[in-house]
Amino acid sequence: MAVVFEASTSPIVGREGDIVGARQLKERLMREKESNISMRIDETEDKSGVRVAGRGVLHLSVLIETMRREGFEFQVGRPQVVYKTDEHGNKLEPIEEATLDVPNDYSGKAIEVMGTAGGIMEDMASDETMTHLVFRIPSRGTMGLKTRILNVTHGEGVLFHHFREYGPYTGEMQGRKNGGMIAMSTDKAVAYALDTLQQRGRLFVKPGDECYEGMIVGESAKEGDMVVNVSKTKNLGNQRSSTADKAIQLTPPVTFTLEEALEYIEDDELVEVTPQSIRMRKRLLSATDRRKANKN
C-alpha cells in the first residue's frame, strides 16, 4: 500500500499543529527514508507531495501517528495498492489470503460482504457454533473490511489477512455506497442544525466542533454527496411550535481511528491529520470546483 503526504491546505491549518510547512514535511519523511528500510519514500512526480509505500494501512498509520505526535499537521490521500506488470505487460495486483471465523448465524452475511470486496471462497468448515472461512482477496478489497465484518457479525467476527502473491488485476471495485454530508461553510457545528441532519444519516461531528467548507461531517443515508449547513440556527420569532422548547437529543457522533479514516475515504477525498484531530475532507473544498471537476 502507498499514500501521498501533502502539506495541509485546510482553511484552519496551523491552529492545532506547530509544524505545517511543505519543506518541513518533506525533510521529515526523507529522514525516515534513511532510517526505515521497510518503507519506500520518494517525492511525487509533480513535487507536490511525498509518496510513502509500506506493508499495509496499519504499517503506514504507525508513521502518520508518530508524526502527528511530533507536532506535524498535514494531509494524506487514500491508500493505493502498488501494482506490477508481468513479462507480457499484464497488470498485476497484490492478492491476500483472508481467514474469517464467525458465528454460524452470521456466516451468510459475512460471505456476502467478502464477495462484494472481491473475495473468492477457497475453504469453509463449521462446527456447532462457529464457521471458519478462507478467501483469496485483492488487497484493495481489505480496506475497511474489518469494520464491515464486525458490523454484520455484531462484533463477533474475527478477520485476519496476509499477503500471498501478485496476481492478475481483477477489475474495478465498487466504492463506498453512501454519500457524504459535506459542510458548506467554515464555522462551528450547532445542535439545532445537527438535530435536523441526524435524521438524514450518521454524523461525524458534535456541537462546538470546528468545521469548514468541504469537510466531511457525516454520512448520508442515500447515494451521492449532499452539501449541508452545520451552523444553521433556529429562527427566533413570536410564535412557538409545540416542540420548540423540547431539549435536542443528539445521537453520539461516529468516531474514526486513523486507520479507519484512511480506509473510509474515496479517491477524491483526504484525511487531515493534526496533533489533536483526525478529519476527513474533499480534495476540492469548494462545491463549485467539485461540480466543474465532475463535468470534466
Feature annotation, model-predicted:
Residues M1-N296:
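Accessory interaction regions appended to the cores of large information-processing enzymes
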